[in-house]
């Protein structure tokens, strides 16, 4: 996890200095934050695997959901957006961990 934290701190410092684009970072902080979440998911999943407790850690995107955040412009209803998170919480995902999911499928990232 220290590697992911360092990357996020590097991005934060680049933004504070106003030179994130020159350093090769994307212009959207939202995208960088999501990449950080995916990286952290992988790191925590590996830690949990080593503990042998059977805890599965994954991350997911609900999709573009009709919410206040999207000002009602989403293509999915909140119930549709909740399908993948609920599946990850209570469904049989075959012991998969450290992955990124969308539309109830693993997305390579």
Predicted stretch roles:
Residues 1-50, 61:
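Catalytic loop of short-chain dehydrogenase/reductase
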Residues 59-62, 67, 71-109:
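C-terminal helical subdomain
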């Amino acid at each position: 996890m220290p590697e992911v934290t360092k990357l996020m701190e590097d991005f934060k410092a680049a933004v504070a200095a106003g030179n994130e684009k020159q350093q090769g970072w994307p212009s959207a902080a939202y995208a960088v934050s999501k990449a950080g979440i995916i990286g952290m998911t992988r790191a925590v999943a590996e830690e949990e695997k080593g503990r042998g407790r059977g805890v599965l850690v994954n991350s997911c995107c609900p999709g573009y959901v009709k919410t206040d955040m999207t000002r009602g412009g989403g293509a999915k209803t909140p119930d549709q957006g909740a399908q993948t998170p609920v599946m990850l919480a209570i469904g049989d995902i075959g012991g998969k961990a450290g992955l990124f999911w969308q539309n109830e499928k693993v997305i390579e990232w």
